[in-house]
Amino acid sequence: MSCSCGSSCGCGSNCTCGKMYPDLEEKSSSAQATVVLGVAPEKAHFEAAAESGETAHGCGCGSSCKCNPCNC
């Protein structure tokens, strides 16, 4: 999950705070989405890089489509 409050904020599948592409904004509906999860070997070096990139922005995705500590 990536969060950069400057241009866009992807807070999971239902939240895009920055509205970088407003035409692609998800509309709420009663339809349910199915998520298929798989199993793959652990890639420790990739995960460490992803985590360090997330903390470099200084914000994490919070509630109500906001990034903490900054609002998107």
Curated annotation (Swiss-Prot):
Keyword Metal-binding recorded: yes
Database matches in Pfam families: Metallothio_2 (PF01439)
Domain of life from the UniProt record: Eukaryota
MF-aspect GO terms: cadmium ion binding; copper ion binding; nickel cation binding; zinc ion binding
Keyword annotations from UniProtKB, A to Z: Metal-binding, Metal-thiolate cluster
Keyword Metal-binding attributed: yes
Expression (tissue specificity): Expressed in leaves of mature plants.
Function of the protein: Metallothioneins have a high content of cysteine residues that bind various heavy metals. Functions as a metal chelator of nickel (Ni), cadmium (Cd), zinc (Zn) and copper (Cu). Possesses higher affinity for Ni and Cd ions compared to Zn and Cu ions.
Family: Belongs to the metallothionein superfamily. Type 15 family.
Protein name: Metallothionein-like protein 1B
